């Protein structure tokens, strides 16, 4: 379980394929505090640490995970949002996030709002409306509030702190980068 409050931006330093699995090695200041078997959210995807040292750690994504998330599109040097698993007694500053991605969406527009930004996302319309206005949504692991909701998309507002401390800044509108979407548990 996670909160959607990003602790660090990690850098993918190695991608290694083994059959249908993908081993990702991530450099992060969190690495020295991690242990094998711990859960870490990578762009909202819950993955288990399988190896670690003081500077980096490795996780493995299976085919099912790669098919349903944006992890398959990562390259060496990619920036990923990271959050360690929630511990009993920790503050819940964001919202309850499972780390099981509902679907991949696409950023289709960014509007500057004089010091903040509105990001517009679209997703598979056959799923219907998976968000509600003023409800919570997780985009690439970041806990956000839905500003506008429609049948195949939604908008969120990004404050300067979130822009600076997450990988929202590198989302390139022209590249239509895939983003991991997870709607709030209580929306179901």
Language-model regions, residue ranges each:
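Conserved loop->alpha-helix
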Residues: 1-188
